[in-house]
UniProtKB/Swiss-Prot annotation:
Family per similarity comment: Belongs to the coronaviruses ns4.9 protein family.
One Pfam family, short name: Corona_NS1
Reported effect, residue 2 to K: In strain: Isolate BCQ.3994
Effect of residue 43 to F: In strain: Isolate BCQ.571, Isolate BCQ.1523, Isolate BCQ.2590 and Isolate BCQ.7373
Effect caused by changing residue 28 to L: In strain: Isolate BCQ.3994
Protein name: Non-structural protein of 4.9 kDa
Highest taxon, organism lineage: Viruses
Amino acid sequence: MTTKFVFDLLAPDDILHPFNHVKLIIRPIEVEHIIIATTMPAV
């Protein structure tokens, strides 16, 4: 997980981002992965 990704979650730049429609689709998937990664015990 990168700092920029975290910043994008806290302050989304979807309006200015040229691929905002792509990010709107990808972000929920990435968020789900983060939730899984943070709730599951480290292997």
